[in-house]
Amino acid sequence: MTEAFALPFFWTALIASLVLAGIHAYMGFHIVRRGVIFVDLALAQMAALGVALALVLRVKEDGPYTYLLALGMTFVGAAVFSWLRGQERRNVPMEALIGIVFATAQATVFLILEKTSAGAEHIKETLVGSLFTVDPRRVITVALLYAAIGAAHFVLRKPFFEITNDPRGAEARGRKLFWWDLAFYAMFGLMVTSSVQIAGVLLVFGLLVIPAVAGLMATSRTGVALAIGWVLALVGSMMGLIGSIRFDLPAAPSILVSLTILLVLLGIVLTLRQKPAART
C-alpha cells in the first residue's frame, strides 16, 4: 500500500480525481434531483462522438480542434435536452429520450470508428480514461475551468436550485425553463467534455451520481449532503487508485467499484440505524 504514495503519477491521478469529484458531486445533486440520471452518459457519449469525428478527419487527437469538435457535440446535446423537457408533457419520460440520444450517439461512434485502425483503442480510452498518464498541466487547466463553472453556478444558484427542486413552480414564477436548462446543460457539457478526456465515461458517471446519491441517502440538507458526497469521493478515489496499483488494474474502473462499495456500506449503516428507531 505504501509504495503507491511514492509514485509521482499516483498523486497526479489522485489530484485529478479530487478535482473531478469536487464539481461532479455538486452537479450530481442537480442531476439526481432532476431525475435525469443518465444525461451525463449521454453528453459524454456526444463528446466521444466529436472526438471520433476528429479521428476520422485526421485532426490531431490532443489538439484544440478535437476539443472544439467534442465541445460542439456536447452543446448540441445540451440544446436537445433543454428542448426535450417540453416533450415530457406528451407523456414521454425524459430518461427514455436521454437513452435514445445516448444509444444513437454510441452507435454512431461505433460506425465511425469501425473502419479506423485505432478504433478499438479509442473506444476503450473513452470508457476508462487515462488517469495514470494525465499531464499535470491538463489537471491545472481543468481545475481552473471547473472553478469558473463553480463560480457561475454560485452566482446563478437561485434559479438553478428553483428549477431543480420545483420546475413547474419556477416556471409559474416567470423562469424561462428552456433558457435556464440550456445554460445548465451547456456548463454541464463543458464540464463533461473536459473530464471524459481524463477519467473516461464510466468514472465520470460514477463521480457524478454515486457521491450525490450517498449524500441524499444520508440527509435532506443540501450542504451536509454535498460534504458527505465529497468525503465519499475522496475515500473512494484513494481506495481505487491504491487497489489499481496493488493489483495492476485500470484506475477508473477500480475507483468506480470502490465508490459503489462505499455506497453499499453506507446504505447498510443507514438501514441498521433506522431499525432501532423503528422499534421505539
Predicted regions and their residues:
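Membrane-interface helix termini and inter-helical loops of multi-pass transporters
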Residues: 1-6, 59-62, 118-134, 242-245
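Membrane-interfacial amphipathic/re-entrant helices at transmembrane-helix boundaries
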Residues: 1-22, 64
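Short loop segments and helix-boundary regions at transmembrane helix junctions
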Residues: 29-42, 52-119, 215-227, 244-247, ...
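Cytosolic-side transmembrane-helix boundaries in multi-pass membrane proteins
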Residues: 57, 249-280
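Transmembrane helix-bundle core of multi-pass membrane transporters
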Residues: 94-159, 183
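Membrane-helix/interface signature in polytopic inner-membrane proteins
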Residues: 151-184
